[in-house]
């Protein structure tokens, strides 16, 4: 063991550290779609790209550009796969852990998570005194989760996930 280590995808603290990594490769590039750390409550996804499996990865931004809620369409990407027999069709599979909380604005709990992990002890203490019953998820019934499957769209290296009320695999080359 040596003192050497490498950092491939650094972020500061929750909710900005990343989880739920969905890796896929396309045209020689490696992609990661990740989620912030806000429990079962959704948050903006982030797409990153690298030339090799081990990076370094370059963050490209939120693939859900048209999602005004900043919640990845109220879901968390868990997997991406290329559809066999299709020219360039990739599908993102996402979990919608809390369909009962879709009306809860992201800004409400984003601020709480930022304060919860603040370097300022007064901010952390203020969160401990808050009534967090509206966002608490330790008793969430994830058996009620549902799913979102959407096709990916590519522009250069950037990946986009657009909302579609319905779509068919047959509509893609």
Give the residues covered by each predicted segment.
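Carbohydrate-active catalytic/glycan-binding domains of CAZyme proteins
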Residues: 1-173
């Amino acid at each position: 063991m040596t003192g050497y280590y490498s950092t491939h995808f650094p972020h500061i603290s929750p909710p900005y550290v990343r989880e739920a990594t969905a890796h896929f490769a396309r045209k020689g590039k490696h992609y990661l779609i990740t989620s912030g750390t806000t429990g079962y409550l959704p948050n903006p996804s982030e797409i990153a790209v690298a030339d090799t499996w081990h990076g370094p990865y370059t963050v490209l931004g939120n693939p859900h550009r048209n999602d005004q809620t900043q919640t990845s369409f109220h879901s968390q990407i868990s997997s991406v796969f290329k559809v066999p027999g299709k020219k360039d069709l990739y599908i993102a599979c996402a979990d919608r852990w809390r369909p009962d909380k879709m009306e809860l604005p992201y800004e409400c709990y984003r601020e709480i998570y930022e304060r919860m992990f603040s370097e300022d002890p007064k901010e952390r203490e203020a969160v401990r005194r808050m009534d967090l019953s509206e966002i608490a998820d330790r008793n969430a019934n994830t058996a009620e989760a549902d799913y979102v499957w959407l096709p990916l769209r590519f522009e250069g290296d950037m990946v986009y996930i657009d909302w579609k009320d319905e779509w068919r695999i047959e509509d893609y080359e």
